[in-house]
């Protein structure tokens, strides 16, 4: 009877361990899935630009921003929970999505400038300045501000006679 109880206890422990490892692996998988999703959107973004489909590229980047927004919601719901590295992983995913979207907007601004669509380029850079206001996003704002100043060189204001 003691052997049977010990065997059952061992099996229960093994099942519990397997369940824990599976859940840990699922947690890791969700982060990989998010990274793959961002990567897919980035590839589609650049493919659309390559084929001069600006509106489609914008939608791809908006999808990355939407993922970032969802992650922000997840983090804000979990912020009061002590404990796991889950929030840290969520923050990493959030930062990755934000930085990727900001870089894509900057690339779109450059693309539009090359295509001599200066007003759209300027608006794209202004979007970076207006949207990415966090302290960790300062670099992107500064790049966008410099790009706007560079656009002023390419398209000076009309002179008044």
Model-derived segments and their meaning:
Residues 32, 67-81, 92-99, 130-143:
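Short solvent-exposed coil/turn linkers within tandem alpha-helical repeat scaffolds
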Residues 23-44:
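Bacterial Sec signal peptide processing site at the extreme N-terminus
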Residues 80-105, 146-161:
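Alpha-helical linker/edge segments of TPR/alpha-solenoid repeat scaffolds
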């Amino acid at each position: 009877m003691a052997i049977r109880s010990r065997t059952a206890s061992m099996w229960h422990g093994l099942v519990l361990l397997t369940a824990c490892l599976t859940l840990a692996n699922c947690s890791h998988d969700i982060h990989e899935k998010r990274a793959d999703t961002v990567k897919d959107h980035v590839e589609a973004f650049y493919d659309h630009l390559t084929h001069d489909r600006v509106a489609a590229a914008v939608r791809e980047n908006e999808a990355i921003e939407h993922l970032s927004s969802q992650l922000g919601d997840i983090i804000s719901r979990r912020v009061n929970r002590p404990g796991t590295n889950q929030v840290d992983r969520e923050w990493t995913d959030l930062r990755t999505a934000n930085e990727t979207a900001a870089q894509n907007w900057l690339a779109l601004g450059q693309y539009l400038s090359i295509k001599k669509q200066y007003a759209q380029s300027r608006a794209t850079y202004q979007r970076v300045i207006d949207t990415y206001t966090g302290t960790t996003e300062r670099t992107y704002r500064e790049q966008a501000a410099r790009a706007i100043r560079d656009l002023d060189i390419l398209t000076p204001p009309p002179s008044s006679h």
